[in-house]
From Swiss-Prot:
A zinc finger (C4-type) spans 34-56. InterPro entries: AcCoA_carboxyl_beta (IPR034733), Acetyl_CoA_COase_Trfase_b_su (IPR000438), ClpP/crotonase-like_dom_sf (IPR029045), COA_CT_N (IPR011762), Znf-ACC (IPR041010). The gene is accD. This is Acetyl-coenzyme A carboxylase carboxyl transferase subunit beta. It is found in: Cytoplasm. SUPFAM superfamilies: ClpP/crotonase (SSF52096).
């Protein structure tokens, strides 16, 4: 027997021995490998922990509907503007027609676009909620995303509801050109009208939150929350380094870096997010049951409360 025949025979024996193992039925996706620490986790346990690795705390991405299930009390979610769907006004084509790309993502995600909006209860407290989905064209903000968020904010303003937006986006959608960019000002205007009614707005920045979303409604909150180690910024890291010709810090454009420099108010792990949001919304209620001492006495006029602040701009303050 030649050396070649010997190797061929042994290869056939090896394949025969491995065949029963290959035929063994193993549930697809039974285990999940952490992208950060490489730990293997039973997928069911990972989902029960809201897709957060128990070994290192790495936050895996979650879809918009899963995020709603994590935050909203069961049976209280009412989706709004679900029938608003994108079109292709510019007849845009890159490697594929924009209209075809939209159909592919709609079939893949079972979403009409990169955000879902609605109302519900969070620990019994009503709110208006928008959740962006990075799985739909990178969570890019097109005209429909802008319209749905704008409608949600306007609904919250009319109904006196706090608004929470969970951001996950690569920025404005290039396939819609200026129609995409104008959503930045459109949503910002709606949020300003919401603010004048003294209503609460909280954006939650997840990985990633970049581009035009960061440059508009993601940074306009009364309180700005972020998930741990989320990438948050406007331009990409390499673009900034090449423009400035400087090496950026390793933690640049992370939620921890932004917290250190005052751009976000708190970093909240996903497993604590629902409780934290409920506490913030509860404390903002005009009549909070556990803080009666903070309510104004009946004889105190609300306008009088601000007089000492106004007086600081007069010369009498310095006499």
């Amino acid at each position: 027997m030649s050396l070649f025949d010997w190797f061929a025979a042994n290869r056939q024996n090896s394949e025969t021995q491995l065949q029963p193992q290959q035929e063994r039925e193993i549930a697809d996706g039974l285990w999940t490998k952490c992208k950060s620490c490489d730990a293997l986790t039973y997928t069911k346990d990972l989902r029960n922990n809201q897709m957060v690795c128990k070994e290192c705390g790495f936050h895996n991405r979650v879809g918009s509907r899963e995020r709603v299930r994590q935050l909203i009390d069961e049976g209280t979610w009412t989706e709004i503007s679900q029938n608003v769907a994108p079109t292709d006004p510019l007849k845009f084509r890159d490697k594929k027609a924009y209209s075809d790309r939209l159909k592919d993502y709609q079939e893949k995600t079972n979403l009409t676009d990169a955000v879902i909006t609605g109302t519900g209860l969070i620990d019994g407290l009503p709110l208006a909620l928008a959740v962006m989905d990075f799985g739909f064209m990178g969570g890019s903000m097109g005209s429909v995303v802008g319209e749905k968020i704008c409608r949600l904010v306007e609904h919250g303003t009319a109904e006196g509801l706090p608004v929470v937006v969970v951001c996950a986006s690569g920025g404005a959608r290039m396939q819609e050109g200026m129609l995409s960019l104008m959503q930045m000002a459109k949503i910002s205007g709606a949020l300003e009208r919401h603010r004048t009614k003294k209503l609460l707005y909280i954006p939650v920045l997840t990985n990633p939150t970049t581009g035009g979303v960061t440059a508009s409604f993601a940074m306009l909150g009364d309180l700005i929350l972020a998930e741990p180690k989320a990438t948050i910024g406007f331009a990409g890291r390499r673009v900034i380094e090449q423009t400035l010709r400087e090496k950026l810090p390793d933690d640049f454009q992370t939620s921890e870096y932004l917290l250190q420099h005052g751009f976000v108010d708190a970093i909240v792990p996903r497993t604590e997010l629902k409780k934290t949001l409920a506490q913030m919304i509860s404390l903002h209620q005009p009549f909070h049951p556990i803080l009666p001492e903070l309510q104004l006495a009946p004889h105190v006029e609300k306008e009088k409360v601000y007089e000492p602040i106004a007086s600081t701009s007069t010369n009498d303050f310095y006499k």
